[in-house]
Curated annotation (Swiss-Prot):
Keywords: ATP-binding, Cytoplasm, Kinase, Magnesium, Metal-binding, Nucleotide metabolism, Nucleotide-binding, Phosphoprotein, Transferase. The lineage of its organism: Bacteria, Bacillati, Bacillota, Bacilli, Lactobacillales. It is found in: Cytoplasm. It comes from Streptococcus pneumoniae (strain P1031). Pfam families: NDK. This is Nucleoside diphosphate kinase. Major role in the synthesis of nucleoside triphosphates other than ATP. The ATP gamma phosphate is transferred to the NDP beta phosphate via a ping-pong mechanism, using a phosphorylated active-site intermediate.
Length: 137
C-alpha cells in the first residue's frame, strides 16, 4: 500500500483546522498510519526537510514560519495516496487553489514579503515520501 507524509503547518494548527484536515483524510478512505503533534520544530529539522530550498533568498521566512508554532505530522496510506492527497491539498498558491481543496478553502494569500500560509504539506513523490517519513519518524 502506498504511503505519503503530511504536515499540518503552524497556521493550520493555530486556526483550529486539525480536525477538518483529519476528517477529510478519513472521509477519503485513507488510513492514518502515524500521527504526532510537535509543539516545537527545530530549524535543523526544517532545513533537512526543505533541503532543496536552503540557500535560496526566499527560504529564511519559510524556516521562520515553519518553526513559529506547533505542527501535526503524519503518515497516511491508501491507493494512489500521494497523487490523491496532493489533489486534496490544492495548488500551493492560495489564489490558484480550487474551492473544495484544503488550500482553496482555508489558505491565506501572502502579502508582499510574507510567507504563503497554505495550511498543509504533502510529499510530492514516492521518493520524497520515503525520505520525509524517515526524517520525521
Amino acid at each position: 500500500m502506498e504511503q505519503t507524509f503530511f504536515i499540518i503547518k503552524p497556521d493550520g494548527v493555530k486556526r483550529g483546522l486539525v480536525g477538518e484536515v483529519l476528517k477529510r483524510i478519513e472521509q477519503r478512505g485513507f488510513t492514518i498510519e502515524k500521527l504526532e503533534f510537535r509543539s516545537q520544530v527545530s530549524e535543523e529539522l526544517i532545513d533537512q526537510h526543505y533541503q532543496d530550498l536552503v540557500g535560496q533568498s526566499f527560504y529564511p521566512p519559510i524556516r521562520e514560519f515553519m518553526t513559529s508554532g506547533p505542527v501535526l505530522v503524519g503518515v497516511i496510506s491508501g491507493p494512489k495516496v500521494i497523487e490523491t492527497w496532493r489533489t486534496m491539498m490544492g495548488a500551493t498558491r492560495p489564489e490558484e487553489a480550487l474551492p473544495g481543496t484544503i488550500r482553496g478553502d482555508f489558505a491565506k494569500a501572502a502579502g508582499e514579503n510574507e510567507v504563503i500560509q497554505n495550511v498543509v504539506h504533502g510529499s510530492d513523490s514516492e521518493e520524497s515520501a520515503k525520505r520525509e517519513i524517515a526524517l520525521w519518524f
